[in-house]
Amino acid sequence: MKRWLPIFLLILVLTDRVVVRAQTDAEVQARKDALDVAGAFSNDGFKIRDGHSCGLVKPHEHALVAVNLYAGNQYWFSAATAEPSKIAVSVYDETGKQVTTESYNNGEKAAAGFSPANSGQYLVSVDLVEGNGGSFCLVYSYK
């Protein structure tokens, strides 16, 4: 019993220090809109990957998300923002070179699709084209 007491106290202290940030209403709305866009690709056999990335997109800044992709798969990256603005989604390889993608842009919603020739880490960029910025959400689909 004496051995478990320090372990329990350590867990208690560590969990007390963990700060969990609750999602804002804007992030929830952006995720809903991003899932709506991704749902259109599921009609073509794409599976929506579990998880999502939310954050803030600001003028003249890129919101980057690192993803590991596999050669031979097809991917669609869908993003949305709750605030009235125009966004774009771009994909870059591990050297920072932009890859050629199919694009969908509709104001607050955007998507980029491609099939990587090589497996590895890629960067997905959500860019603010017009507007003052705000919360965004990114989800991706594969097949």
Predicted regions and their residues:
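Extended extracellular/luminal ectodomain segments enriched in beta-structured repeat modules
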Residues: 68-76
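Edge beta-strands of jelly-roll/beta-sandwich modules across compartments, strongly enriched
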Residues: 130-143
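Bacterial N-terminal signal peptides
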Residues: 6-16
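Exposed aromatic-hydrophobic patches
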Residues: 65-66, 109-116
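Short, surface-exposed beta-strand/strand-loop-strand elements in extracellular ectodomains
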Residues: 83-98
